[in-house]
Structures are given as structure tokens and as C-alpha cells.
A protein has these predicted regions:
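Conserved beta-strand residues within beta-sheet cores
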Residues: 35-39, 94-96, 110-112, 124-126
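Short, solvent-exposed helix-to-loop capping segments enriched in aromatics
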Residues: 22-32, 81-88
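Compact, glycine-rich, soluble single-domain proteins
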Residues: 59-78, 82, 94
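HotDog/MaoC-like acyl-thioester-processing domains
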Residues: 2-22, 89, 104-105, 116-179
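Catalytic strand-loop segment that frames the active site of acyl-thioester-processing enzymes
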Residues: 30-68
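A generic structural signal for short beta-strands and their flanking turns/coil linkers
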Residues: 48-50, 91-95, 109, 121-123, ...
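Hydrophobic beta-strand-centered segment that forms part of the acyl-chain substrate-binding groove
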Residues: 79-109, 115
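A structural signal for short, well-ordered beta-strand segments
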Residues: 52, 95-99, 113, 127, ...
Length: 179
């Protein structure tokens, strides 16, 4: 079943949803609403380590030859990186990646993600992707783990910057009036 594409069923009674194919779904804390048919499913989840299986589908095809768009491959690798850390408020902030070969419709990629710098909020995760024995992807992702949702953190930073700016403007106006 490892190389079987679960999305290419012949009739609806044979369809296996990615959510059903993901036995670790209850252990996953990060990115809970991610569409697994675009990101892959976890089959190994350990501290600082995750392995996922990424199934290529017709929705990912970019030309008549069945070439899979590299953006989907990146998403699958990024999801594996997130799972290696597996914290609720973890977001990607950078990546250095290499594609070593194209994917075609029907290919199944296994991503192996290893996280480093466990004691730090800013983490680095190395992700390698193989189709069978052939390495097709390698990348290093930078992720940050936050104490709250990134939008909450962002809003607090905006408010803090606004307060600093307003204070500076008041001080400048007061200096102008006194000078």
C-alpha cells in the first residue's frame, strides 16, 4: 500500500480520504486544518522527527504530460517540517530548497524531516524527499514556535509600535512648543 495512490480510486466506494489514511491525526498539534490531499499524511511522528507520504493527484498537474507543479512538492515538504516540531503555534519563516527531479502524476513521495535546536524557539528542520529510492527533494526549513497564534502576536507588535510612535510624536510636539 505504500506506493498505492489513495486518490486514484475507480469508484466512490473505493475512495479513502487522506484523513482516514492518517492514523496519527489525533497526535498532530500543528496546522490542524491543512488539506492532507495537498500536503501528505504522517506515518511516523516522534520528538523532532516526522515522516510523511505525499500522494500526487490530478489537481497538482501543471501540463499535458502529467508534471506535478513544484509548489505542491514544497507544501508537502513544509508540512513534514511542521510535523517534526509538532507545536500548535509553529510557522515557517524561511527555506533553502533543492529539487533534484520532477514528479509525475501517480508518484508517491516519502518525506523524512529531522528537527534541530530543540531548546530554541527558532528551529531548523532538514527535509529529504524520495520517490522509491530516488532523492527528488532536499531542503532546510526555518520555523519559529510562538506562545500564541501569529496573528495575535502580530497585532500586539503593531499596537506596541504605534504606542512608541505616538509617544515620540508627543515628545517632539512638546519639544517644539517648549523650544
Amino acid at each position: 500500500m505504500a506506493d498505492e495512490n489513495i486518490f486514484e480510486a475507480k469508484d466512490e466506494s473505493q475512495i479513502i480520504l487522506p484523513e482516514d489514511e492518517n492514523p496519527l491525526r489525533n497526535e498532530i498539534k500543528t496546522a490542524p486544518l491543512t488539506k492532507l490531499n495537498f500536503s501528505g499524511t504522517a506515518f511516523l511522528l516522534e520528538k523532532n522527527h516526522a515522516k510523511t507520504r505525499f500522494f500526487t493527484t490530478a489537481d497538482m498537474v501543471s501540463d499535458a504530460e502529467g508534471l506535478i507543479h513544484s509548489g505542491f512538492v514544497f507544501m508537502g515538504a513544509n508540512y513534514a517540517a511542521l510535523l517534526a516540531i509538532n507545536e500548535e503555534f509553529c510557522v515557517s519563516i524561511g527555506a533553502r530548497i533543492n529539487f533534484f527531479g520532477p514528479l509525475k502524476l501517480g508518484d508517491v513521495v516519502e518525506f523524512d524531516a529531522q528537527a534541530r535546536f530543540e531548546e530554541s524557539r527558532k528551529r531548523e528542520v532538514k527535509v529529504v524527499g524520495h520517490v522509491k529510492e530516488v532523492k527528488i527533494f532536499e531542503g532546510t526549513f526555518q520555523l519559529v514556535t510562538l506562545e500564541e497564534h501569529i496573528f495575535v502576536t502580530q497585532q500586539k507588535n503593531i499596537q506596541k509600535e504605534a504606542a512608541i510612535r505616538q509617544k515620540k510624536e508627543r515628545e517632539e510636539a512638546q519639544a517644539k512648543n517648549n523650544g
